[in-house]
Structures are given as C-alpha cells and as structure tokens.
Amino acid sequence: MKNVTDSFVSLGHWPSAGSFGWNTDILATNLINLSVVIGVLIFFGKGVLSDLLDNRKQRILNTIRNSEELRGGAIEQLEKARARLRKMEMEADQFRVNGYSEIERDKWNLINSTSKTLEQFENFKNETIQFEQQRAINQVRQRVFQQALQGALGTLNSCLNKELHLRTISANIGILGAMKEITD
C-alpha cells in the first residue's frame, strides 16, 4: 500500500506546463472514489433491485387481475343491458303505434349510460396501473439510493483507518511543499 501511495505522490511532483493540461493526480480526479462507489452500487443494488422489481411485478399483476375482474363485471352488466335492450325492442314492436319515439330514446339512453360506465371502468383500470407503476418506480429509486448510501458509508468507514489517514495527510503536505518550492 505504501508503494501505491508513493507512486501517487511522485505523480504530484511533475511540473505543469501551464494553466491547461491533463491532471495526472489520480487522487485529485476522484477516479478511485467513483469506481468504489459504482462497484458498491452494482454489488449491493442488483439483488435488492431484482427483489423489489419482482415484488412490484406481482403487485402490478394483482392490480391488473383486479381490474380485469372489474372489467368482467362491466361486461356482464353490458350483457344484461343488452338483454334488457332486446326485451325493450320486443316491447317496442308490440307498442310501436303508441310510443315508438319514447322507447327509442330510452334505448339510446341505456346504451349511452352503459358505454360510459364501461369507459369509466377502463379509465380507472388504466389510471390504477399507471399509478402503481409510478409508485413502484419511486419506491425502487428510493430503496436503491438508500442502499447505495449505506453501502458507501460502510465501505468508507471500514477502509479509513488512522495510519492511512496520517499517510494521506503527509503525502498531501509533501505535494503542497513541492508545489510551493516550484512556485518560489
């Protein structure tokens, strides 16, 4: 570990060519921290994410089944309404002379109200599915973010010890001293 730290310290002694150039100090560019965080996110997040997605999938499928049952009930009501419509049409034939226009108006009102009811059930089903999907996505995002933060904090706390902290401070002081000598 000391050789790795020394190699990073020696990278800091390279003279810079001006105000523009490549930053060769790997500690200053945060590549190690980013790779550790990404690795932790991938390692801890994929199992949690798959479990959450499976649970949400089951809930969404249950919601879809419930919506399909509601749809089935609406279709059943529609069939009953159609049966009543057929019955009314037979009565209309019998009473055509007296009240044809009134029966026709009742028929269309019944068809329209049944169609509106069926359309409302379809809209409710679609809104429920969309709401459940959005809620599932939000819960997964929140859960992954919490897991990532907990994993990153745990990794950082387990990796930082007093000796490493003191060596890093000493290396940074050496880099600053070398930079001061270069600028003087």
From Swiss-Prot:
HAMAP family listed in its UniProt record: ATP_synth_b_bprime
Function (record text): F(1)F(0) ATP synthase produces ATP from ADP in the presence of a proton or sodium gradient. F-type ATPases consist of two structural domains, F(1) containing the extramembraneous catalytic core and F(0) containing the membrane proton channel, linked together by a central stalk and a peripheral stalk. During catalysis, ATP synthesis in the catalytic domain of F(1) is coupled via a rotary mechanism of the central stalk subunits to proton translocation. Component of the F(0) channel, it forms part of the peripheral stalk, linking F(1) to F(0).
Entry's family note: Belongs to the ATPase B chain family.
Protein name, as recorded: ATP synthase subunit b, chloroplastic
UniProt lineage: Eukaryota, Viridiplantae, Streptophyta, Embryophyta, Tracheophyta
Compartment(s) of residence: Plastid, Chloroplast thylakoid membrane
Gene field: atpF
Organism: Jasminum nudiflorum (Winter jasmine)
InterPro entries, alphabetized: ATP_synth_b/b'su_bac/chlpt
Membrane topology listed for this record: Single-pass membrane protein
Segments forming a coiled coil: none
Principal location class: plastid
